[in-house]
């Protein structure tokens, strides 16, 4: 199999491997179609005549329209296809009420926190409240590596440039994100490291935290002590003693929270990796667990796939408001809503934002959507959640971590080395990338395109890897020491 027609209603097929000019392809319901030109892997070929202005249909949905008459066998891409997207949309709620049959959950070997939550890692996190102390945090983290022993699995710091010279909602958003990170169950202990004179004050962080475990969350203002390294190591040593009391134990998979993300997508993302991840999401939800889908701009053009699965009118209204609110965000900055596909996306076969979005939302599987979370919000309802956040890889995976995700499933057709604070599994879309960047890979979904595994079989394999990762198996990014954050900024710099 070297091509696929994703939906019987599609007027295109996708090349699973490079298709040479003159190659004949049998298309169900159409007959034989001969490639009129070379079709790169992941790219689209017309299987029917399409008149100028008519829609290109893929995934059973329009992904744009052709700019001129198209004949069967022609290559369809950015040179002859244009988006249909514009601004806000008045969405209608047409509920489908999908049902996920419950399944008895397996267990993974995790940590049980004092407040009853489950964790997949047992770490200490140093969170700077301002960029001025990033290097202090780095030195403090390096000095604290001697504390990593027994059940304490790591000490990490998360540098960023913010926390000062911000105002209003932008400043509040940074503060909420940092506090949300501190609540993550994988952090057995947290040190908020401040300078002492920044806008993101100690009192503001305390107010944002509300009621919290004062043994687990500690503070240090560098301007208040003679030697911040000595004081910092003392605090981290105390947190390490607390963390080492935790031991791995069996925990039901119903307590897992997984994040769903894609980056560096290609034309196979929506055919191999993303639907595999979507099936894993459904498996987690069926076991009583939680999954979180973000990247709002990469839902544009595929909204109905998600909105019709909202479990209630209230959830639908919140989702519709989030989608249109994000479009307003673009427009308020003088940007059009559809300029999303990157050069790498286009090189891999993604033509329009609708094309990208229809593939992106495959990660959400088929479960009902139970809640809509703001940026820096935490998932509290079991089932599939939507999270407000941009498409940017590091910003959105940071938001997924802040939402409480224990493991993040990250599909990519181009490859990327980074890792979020939460374990980040890289799911590759194609065999070529697996061969080229094996050191970045955790799971090869390219086996779906080659026919070695079905989607269901690949999903079973990936789900087992999720359980192993939750039980302590390191991801590729963790093995390479990648633990990074990026904060969504939307405001002036003083």
Residue ranges and their predicted role:
Residues 1-407, 414-417, 422-494:
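Metallocofactor- and cofactor-centric catalytic cores in central/energy metabolism, strongly enriched
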């Amino acid at each position: 199999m070297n091509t696929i027609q994703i939906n019987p209603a599609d007027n295109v097929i996708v090349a699973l491997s490079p298709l040479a000019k003159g190659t004949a392809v049998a298309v169900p319901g159409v007959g034989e179609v001969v490639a009129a030109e070379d079709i790169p892997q992941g790219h689209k070929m017309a299987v029917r005549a399409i008149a100028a202005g008519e829609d290109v249909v893929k995934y059973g949905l329009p992904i744009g329209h052709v700019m001129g008459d198209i004949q069967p066998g022609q290559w369809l891409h950015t040179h002859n296809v244009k988006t249909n997207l514009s601004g806000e949309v008045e969405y209608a709620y047409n509920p489908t009420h999908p049902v996920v049959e419950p399944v008895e959950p397996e267990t993974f070997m995790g940590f049980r926190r004092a407040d009853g939550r489950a964790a997949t890692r047992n770490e200490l996190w140093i969170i700077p409240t301002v960029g001025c102390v990033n290097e202090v945090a780095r030195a403090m983290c390096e000095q604290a590596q001697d504390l990593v022993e027994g059940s304490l699995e790591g000490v990490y710091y998360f540098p960023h440039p913010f926390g000062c010279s911000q105002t209003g909602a932008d400043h509040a958003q940074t503060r909420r994100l940092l506090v949300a990170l501190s609540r993550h169950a994988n952090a057995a202990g947290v040190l908020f490291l401040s300078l002492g004179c920044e806008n993101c004050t100690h009192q503001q962080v305390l107010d944002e935290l509300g009621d919290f475990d004062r043994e687990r969350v500690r503070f240090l203002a560098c301007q208040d002590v003679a030697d911040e390294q000595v004081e910092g190591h003392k605090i981290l040593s105390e947190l390490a003693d607390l963390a080492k009391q935790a031991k791995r134990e069996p925990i039901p998979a119903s307590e897992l929270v997984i994040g769903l993300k894609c980056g560096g997508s290609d034309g196979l993302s929506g055919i191999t990796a993303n639907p595999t991840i979507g099936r894993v999401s459904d498996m987690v939800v069926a076991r009583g667990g939680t999954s979180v889908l973000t990247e709002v701009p990469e839902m544009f053009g595929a909204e109905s796939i998600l909105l019709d699965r909202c479990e209630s009118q209230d959830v639908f209204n919140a989702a519709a408001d989030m989608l249109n609110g994000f479009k307003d965000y673009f427009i308020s900055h003088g940007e059009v809503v559809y300029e999303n596909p990157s050069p790498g996306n286009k090189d891999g076969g993604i033509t329009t934002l609708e094309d990208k979005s229809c593939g992106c939302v495959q990660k959400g599987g088929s479960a009902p959507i139970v809640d809509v979370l703001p940026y820096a919000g935490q998932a509290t309802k079991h089932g599939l959640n939507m999270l407000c956040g941009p498409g940017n890889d590091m910003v959105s995976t940071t938001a997924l971590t802040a939402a409480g995700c224990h493991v993040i499933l990250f599909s990519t057709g181009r490859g990327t080395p980074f890792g979020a604070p939460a374990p980040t599994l890289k799911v590759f879309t194609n065999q070529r990338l697996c061969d080229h960047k094996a050191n970045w890979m955790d799971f090869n979904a390219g086996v779906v395109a080659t026919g070695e595994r079905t989607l269901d079989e690949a999903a079973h394999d990936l789900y087992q890897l999720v359980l192993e990762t939750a039980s302590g198996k390191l991801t590729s990014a963790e093995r390479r020491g990648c633990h990074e954050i990026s904060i969504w900024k939307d405001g002036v710099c003083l």
